[in-house]
């Protein structure tokens, strides 16, 4: 019975987001804006008006696409904050635009797409030169993407 439970993944059925009061959010923190996980790049608060609450104006950049999103909410309301995980995997191959990554468990993942743009070119270039590199993978709200690379410690 206990053999079919998987505790390795670490989320244990946890929600992809958790609530946080608007006034507790901070710049460089994370928040869900328009259904997308974003990093807060700008935040301003307006004073309490004649009717209602103080408002918080949030500007965030999507952590996967880089698109800019804005939202305004009362400071007392709750906003969703994405659960974000960063993992480093060793790059062992690139095939058909997908990365082959070695996990800590020894298993190989081949479901992550090579990022587009400069990062993708840099990964290919270092791989072609035979450098051993680690790929930093960011995962939030059922999405995953390679966001950074670093040389492996010898």
UniProtKB/Swiss-Prot annotation:
Modified residues (Hypusine): 50
Compartments where located: Cytoplasm; Nucleus; Endoplasmic reticulum membrane
UniProt effect for mutating residue 48 to N: In FABAS; in yeast, exhibits reduced ribosome binding, reduced levels of hypusination and transfected cells show impaired synthesis of proteins containing poly-proline tracts
Top-rank lineage group of the source organism: Eukaryota
Result for mutant: residue 106 to R: In FABAS; in yeast, exhibits reduced ribosome binding and cells show impaired synthesis of proteins containing poly-proline tracts
The keyword Membrane appears for this protein: yes
N6-acetyllysine: residues carrying this PTM: 47, 121
Any one Pfam family match given in the protein's UniProt record, by short name: eIF-5a
UniProt tissue specificity: Expressed in umbilical vein endothelial cells and several cancer cell lines (at protein level).
GO cellular component assignments: annulate lamellae; cytoplasm; cytosol; endoplasmic reticulum membrane; membrane; nuclear pore; nucleus; synapse
GO biological process assignments: cellular response to virus; positive regulation of intrinsic apoptotic signaling pathway by p53 class mediator; positive regulation of transcription by RNA polymerase II; positive regulation of translational elongation; positive regulation of translational termination; translational elongation; tumor necrosis factor-mediated signaling pathway
Consequence the record notes for mutating residue 50 to A: Decreases significantly the acetylation at position K-47 and causes total inactivation of eIF5A in supporting yeast growth
Region (Interaction with DOHH): 20-90
Record's comment on post-translational modification: Acetylated by PCAF/KAT2B, regulating its subcellular localization. Deacetylated by SIRT2. Lys-50 undergoes hypusination, a unique post-translational modification that consists in the addition of a butylamino group from spermidine to lysine side chain, leading to the formation of the unusual amino acid hypusine. eIF-5As are the only known proteins to undergo this modification, which is essential for their function.
SMART domains per record: eIF-5a (SM01376)
In-chain residues carrying the UniProt-annotated modification N-acetylalanine: 2
Subunit description: Binds to 80S ribosomes. Actively translating ribosomes show mutually exclusive binding of eIF5a (EIF5A or EIF5A2) and EEF2/eEF2. Interacts with DAPL1; interaction takes place at the polypeptide exit tunnel of hibernating ribosomes and prevents translation. Interacts with DHPS. Interacts with SDCBP. Interacts with DOHH. (Microbial infection) Interacts with HIV-1 protein Rev.
Disease field: Faundes-Banka syndrome: An autosomal dominant disorder characterized by variable combinations of developmental delay, microcephaly, micrognathia and dysmorphic features.
Main function: Translation factor that promotes translation elongation and termination, particularly upon ribosome stalling at specific amino acid sequence contexts. Binds between the exit (E) and peptidyl (P) site of the ribosome and promotes rescue of stalled ribosome: specifically required for efficient translation of polyproline-containing peptides as well as other motifs that stall the ribosome. Acts as a ribosome quality control (RQC) cofactor by joining the RQC complex to facilitate peptidyl transfer during CAT tailing step.
Record's protein name: Eukaryotic translation initiation factor 5A-1
